[in-house]
Amino acid sequence: MGDLGKGYKLVFLGDQGVGKTSIITCFMYGKFDTSYQATIGIDFLSKTTRYEDRTFRLQLWDTAGQERFKSLVPSYIRDSSVAVIVYDVASKQSFINTSKWIEEVRAERGSYVIIVLVGNKTDLVNKRQVSIEEGENKAREFGALFMETSAKAGFNIKPLFCKITSALQGNEAVSWTKQEDLVDVNLKPLMFSSQANHQQESNCSC
């Protein structure tokens, strides 16, 4: 039996429309979907990737940013390995709101989670409202990793996940500890997307 690698749960958080789904889609399928459709509830996809000769099984949990779905979020944060907090660099308010998302993650997971702050939509050069320095400073303030991306342009998507797997490699404590946790995932109560549980494999060459 081949090396299945350790499993890690990545939960994507942030306001509606910041590009969480687009980042995941670009990583999963290498393309940008021009047809915007808001995530309903929670979406879940799985991808196996390799980093420095190690295999990582990533569960990507895409959460809805709408207020009416906020009550679903804490239960998905609770057993996460990584929280990816996304904002739109062309929306100052979405950046301001990342503080609340980070605080919610800390309330549920304390220090037992890797937080990554991601400024998406860097292709909107003329509409930028949040500088790189502001993003870096906030990440430093909250002890988070930081990266800017553009799912539309495919910019920094692979490097983002390479950074995440690199951080996971240095923090074994955040991986699932039980083998059954890798397969026994009950999605039925809160799963609404028809894309749920797609699985792919890739190599992360950084």
Swiss-Prot record:
<keyword id="KW-0449">Lipoprotein</keyword>
<feature type="lipid moiety-binding region" description="S-geranylgeranyl cysteine">
    <location>
        <position position="204"/>
    </location>
</feature>
<comment type="function">
    <text>Protein transport. Regulator of membrane traffic from the Golgi apparatus towards the endoplasmic reticulum (ER).</text>
</comment>
<keyword id="KW-0813">Transport</keyword>
<feature type="binding site">
    <location>
        <begin position="14"/>
        <end position="21"/>
    </location>
    <ligand>
        <name>GTP</name>
    </ligand>
</feature>
<keyword id="KW-0547">Nucleotide-binding</keyword>
<keyword id="KW-0488">Methylation</keyword>
<keyword id="KW-0653">Protein transport</keyword>
<keyword id="KW-0333">Golgi apparatus</keyword>
<dbReference type="InterPro" id="IPR005225">
    <property type="entry name" value="Small_GTP-bd"/>
</dbReference>
<keyword id="KW-0472">Membrane</keyword>
<keyword id="KW-0342">GTP-binding</keyword>
<keyword id="KW-0931">ER-Golgi transport</keyword>
<dbReference type="GO" id="GO:0016192">
    <property type="term" value="P:vesicle-mediated transport"/>
</dbReference>
<dbReference type="InterPro" id="IPR027417">
    <property type="entry name" value="P-loop_NTPase"/>
</dbReference>
<dbReference type="GO" id="GO:0003924">
    <property type="term" value="F:GTPase activity"/>
</dbReference>
<dbReference type="InterPro" id="IPR050227">
    <property type="entry name" value="Rab"/>
</dbReference>
<dbReference type="GO" id="GO:0015031">
    <property type="term" value="P:protein transport"/>
</dbReference>
<dbReference type="Pfam" id="PF00071">
    <property type="entry name" value="Ras"/>
</dbReference>
<feature type="modified residue" description="Cysteine methyl ester">
    <location>
        <position position="206"/>
    </location>
</feature>
<feature type="binding site">
    <location>
        <begin position="62"/>
        <end position="66"/>
    </location>
    <ligand>
        <name>GTP</name>
    </ligand>
</feature>
<keyword id="KW-0636">Prenylation</keyword>
<protein>
    <recommendedName>
        <fullName>Ras-related protein RABH1a</fullName>
    </recommendedName>
</protein>
<feature type="short sequence motif" description="Effector region">
    <location>
        <begin position="36"/>
        <end position="44"/>
    </location>
</feature>
<feature type="binding site">
    <location>
        <begin position="120"/>
        <end position="123"/>
    </location>
    <ligand>
        <name>GTP</name>
    </ligand>
</feature>
<feature type="lipid moiety-binding region" description="S-geranylgeranyl cysteine">
    <location>
        <position position="206"/>
    </location>
</feature>
<comment type="similarity">
    <text>Belongs to the small GTPase superfamily. Rab family.</text>
</comment>
<dbReference type="InterPro" id="IPR001806">
    <property type="entry name" value="Small_GTPase"/>
</dbReference>
<dbReference type="GO" id="GO:0005525">
    <property type="term" value="F:GTP binding"/>
</dbReference>
<dbReference type="GO" id="GO:0000139">
    <property type="term" value="C:Golgi membrane"/>
</dbReference>
<feature type="binding site">
    <location>
        <begin position="150"/>
        <end position="151"/>
    </location>
    <ligand>
        <name>GTP</name>
    </ligand>
</feature>
